[in-house]
């Protein structure tokens, strides 16, 4: 069930007409009608927030998780279920042998590498086991000289879980558990960099849930924490730039997070200010494993433009970026293609939008097929094309991602 059908379902349960809902949510009645009929995809989650508030539901309740049969085709469903089950357990009641911290660190690195490649069907079972192992390690090393290391790797494990669950199509409820545990474990380390990484995870969930103000507050506090160390000159990337980034690179990434939260909150001046800050940092920081640099700043500019409703600007920015510059991560170039596709679709250029989505699928098939916005876009394109000539490949794509029904 796509968001339009869910909006209609909740609206009818309340005995509310489209005109009344549109008036209370301050949206166009024609826009609401098109979304409910499935001929137009919501431009962003931000568009659904006022509608959800009137209906008395969470914005994420208006977006269905990926269809089970689609996730079964890639094996994603079983892997994600294992991670969800691991997070539902009481972390202080997990029973297991004490893991070796060096081995645990190496395996967490392997899990993060799988996440960067969007290989969720392989990642799920490994990450579920690592959550239990990291929780066991913390209990085993309490009040010892290795306690900080144990909490550090526990925080990193939860961080990988946060991004994995969202990219694999899970809602924010279970992901919030991982984010809160990530931030709590990070605080136990006393390390400003680890704490800022934990704050990023928490802000990520807040922003996706529509709580942009809280996300921005979390991000700006983290920037303040790492700022004192960020002025040191950077000669070369850190040896482990994802888990131990240079403070200046981390601060730049936080500015990008702030730009994303500002865009979701429709704060155009805030977006411009945060992107300028990120550009300033990117000019003096080498590219690193976090992929903070000019290409990543440019990609966030595309996202911000489409979130702010400027499809033409999103396409203009996006077509000027070589997605390969965002490698070795697979999700980041794939998301660039998806954001550009959103711009093309908003302009009515379905063929160009389809091309970009197919590029995203080629690069990161599991992530693209689970992505709620992709399903919305493809479903709307299919409905628009029912009375016109079919776009080659569109219905095949719709079948693969479960956007036909």
Where would I find each of the regions flagged by the language model?
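The alpha-helix within a helix-turn-helix
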Residues: 11, 22, 52
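Recognition helix of helix-turn-helix/homeodomain-like DNA-binding domains
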Residues: 26-42, 50, 67
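Short C-terminal boundary/hinge segments that cap the last helix of small helical domains
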Residues: 56-71, 297
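DNA major-groove recognition helix of helix-turn-helix/homeodomain DNA-binding modules
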Residues: 26, 46-61
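Conserved binding/catalytic microenvironments
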Residues: 104-108, 112-405
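Short, charged recognition helix plus adjacent turn
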Residues: 64-95
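A short, Lys/Arg-rich alpha-helix, primarily the initiator
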Residues: 1-14
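Conserved hydrophobic/aromatic packing and binding residues within compact polymer-binding modules
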Residues: 7, 18-22, 32-36, 62
């Amino acid at each position: 069930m796509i968001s339009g059908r869910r909006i209609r379902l909740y609206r009818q349960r309340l005995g509310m007409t489209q005109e009344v809902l549109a008036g209370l949510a301050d949206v166009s009645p024609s826009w609401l009608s098109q979304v409910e009929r499935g001929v137009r995809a919501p431009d962003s989650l931000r568009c659904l927030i006022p509608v959800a508030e009137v209906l008395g539901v969470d914005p994420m309740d208006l977006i269905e998780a990926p269809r089970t049969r689609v996730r079964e085709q890639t094996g994603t469903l079983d892997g994600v279920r294992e991670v969800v089950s691991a997070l539902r357990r009481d972390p202080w009641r997990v029973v297991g042998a004490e893991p070796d911290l060096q081995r645990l660190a190496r395996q967490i690195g392997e899990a993060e590498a799988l996440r960067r490649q969007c290989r969720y069907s392989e990642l799920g079972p490994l990450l579920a086991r690592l959550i239990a192992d990291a929780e066991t390690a913390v209990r085993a090393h309490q009040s010892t000289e290795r306690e900080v290391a144990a909490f550090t790797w526990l925080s990193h494990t939860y961080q990988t879980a946060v991004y994995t669950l969202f990219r694999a199509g899970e809602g924010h409820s279970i992901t919030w558990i991982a984010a809160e545990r990530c931030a709590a474990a990070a605080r136990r380390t006393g390390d400003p960099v680890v704490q800022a990484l934990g704050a990023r995870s928490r802000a990520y969930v807040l922003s996706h849930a529509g709580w942009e103000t809280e996300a921005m507050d979390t991000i700006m506090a983290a920037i303040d924490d790492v700022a004192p160390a960020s002025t040191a000159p950077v000669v070369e990337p850190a040896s482990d730039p994802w888990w131990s980034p240079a403070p200046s690179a981390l601060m730049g990434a936080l500015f990008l997070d702030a730009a994303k939260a500002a865009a979701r909150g429709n704060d155009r001046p805030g977006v411009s200010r945060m992107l300028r800050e990120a550009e300033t940092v990117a000019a003096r920081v080498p590219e690193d494993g976090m992929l903070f640099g000019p290409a990543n700043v440019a990609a966030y500019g595309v996202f911000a433009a489409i979130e702010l409703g400027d499809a033409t600007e999103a396409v203009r920015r996006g077509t000027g970026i070589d997605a390969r510059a965002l490698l070795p991560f697979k999700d980041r170039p794939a998301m660039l293609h998806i954001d550009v596709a959103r711009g093309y679709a908003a302009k009515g250029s379905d063929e160009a939008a389809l091309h970009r989505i197919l590029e995203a699928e080629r690069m990161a098939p599991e992530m693209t097929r689970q992505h709620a916005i992709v399903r919305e876009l493809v479903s709307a394109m299919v409905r628009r094309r029912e009375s016109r000539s079919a776009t080659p490949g569109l219905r095949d794509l719709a079948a693969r991602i479960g956007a036909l029904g």
